[in-house]
Amino acid sequence: MIFVTVGNHFQGFERLLEKVDEIAPRLSHEIVVQRGYSKYVPKNTNHFDFVPANTAMEYIRNADLVISHAGMGTLILCKEYGIPIIIFPRREKFKEHVNDHQMEIAQVLEKREDPNIHIVYEENQLEEKIMEAVGRREIAPLENRGRENLVRTITEFIKTCHG
């Protein structure tokens, strides 16, 4: 199963949802989409607006691949569970976010060259990246050390972003 999540930001992310819906018939995996506040309603995928956090975590845990905005919560869960993730950052110029901090996050992640983290900046790159990433787990899941592990991961990432 491929799980697509756009998070809970108040601006929609139509660009991602429309592209996923377009390529869904060509993929062999079931696709489940969390739409958030997006207005676009997919025709070729299962979808919902929001679910409780524990339900979203289960979707991520059971996914062969996650496609997401550059949200830290989703990224950390994918790292913890060893799930490949495609990051498709929201862009200010498309009115998907109030600034381009997600582009900055994606650029930092791209430099880390983690084989389970794939970065896509343009819609036309998405299908090829899905084919490369689906079912690919090159890194064992991180040990779950609870809150301390989460805090350490976030702290290390922030230090990386700000030099």
Map each language-model feature to its residues.
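Nucleotide-activated sugar donor-binding and catalytic core shared by glycosyltransferases
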Residues: 1-163
